[in-house]
């Protein structure tokens, strides 16, 4: 098989993966995502760094003179891809206007369409759900050209150190056929908690009512620690030193002073927030951090989280409320300036909707889940944490737990009203079915290791090659089916 590999070089053992693929008789014609920090040369393989691809630069040695601008027909066939890619640009190209983003998209499409036609891969393999503009264009082209797609979705067990799970999907990130097959195979069987791997047992116990541990995700704890106290001071000192070095200190100081007198996203949010009333019936909606993969592409049209809340608002009865809470690290990572994913008036639009209340960002998310009648999310981990607490979940995207009992996917007001009525009528969560689902998930996912922040990254160096071996052992048998 001729393989285009979209795999980040930060993943330990990636070169082992390429060697394993070649030893199995496959040809890795193109590797994008590799070699950011090292000059890697692999005979017979084009190596394209992630940074170069992200910035629209071609791989070394690629002749682009015959990579022509995309045809109108191709652009029309990829309208959905284009729509999502434009939102992905909020991360690195927030400063671009819509017209510049569209032209950048056309240029990127031109390059990758040329690559696909020149190197003719039979299979495209992604290390993650594609969520960079260039990688999602590769994904869109592969689907259009009927090229086989294999991708791996990392599901973070971030409340349990060193225990990510990696789930393989075939053909689309929207569903996992291996997981569906495992569910069908286990149909009619009941499993106990002891039948699960130890990491999933611990995860389950961590989020059930009679367990005393702290369920706060490890990544959230580490991120808050990184942006507080001495570490925050050190980070700011480093930024100041860098600004002095590149002579931008005066420009940035002026911009900072001006910012002090302008309204920011936190001020807008705080001016609209209110305390929760647990005596009322409500649906809890924890917002996703944006821009990120969890909403673009995995949320589809509901990358617009206001649209999600509008659907909920139009679907519930007047005596119910919707409690919305911002993601705990949204302002830490992106700062307090308005930007494309949190524009001026963003929170105001939400708060004006019928029965919608904004909760303080420091409000206890687990208390909100516990006192709610249901939780609604695009694909957030709060959804699965809710069903472990026997709360039904409304989802708008395609998370790994989408096939689980007590999870209801909706796409608009009509389907949302039907789900709301089930909840009103007293829908009950069956924990046995949750354990059965985890067993199927356990059977088809492979052990991974977290690499979200620096302490985790250090652990990853020790265990990443074991993770890669797990992936290789899952991937190679699947490729045999395609041969």
Where are these regions (language model features)?
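A donor-sugar binding/catalytic signature common to diverse glycosyltransferases
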Residues: 126-130, 360-407
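Conserved N-terminal ligand/cofactor-binding loop architecture of enzyme catalytic domains
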Residues: 20-113, 117-118, 157-254
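Conserved catalytic-core segment of nucleotide-activated headgroup transferases in glycan assembly
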Residues: 233-343
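Nucleotide-activated donor-binding/catalytic signature segment of Leloir-type glycosyltransferases, i.e.
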Residues: 340-359
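A short, Lys/Arg-enriched amphipathic alpha-helix followed by its capping loop at the start of a domain
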Residues: 13-26, 311-319
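Proline-aspartate-enriched helix->loop->beta-strand connector
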Residues: 120-125
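Leloir-type glycosyltransferase catalytic cores
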Residues: 179-227, 406-483
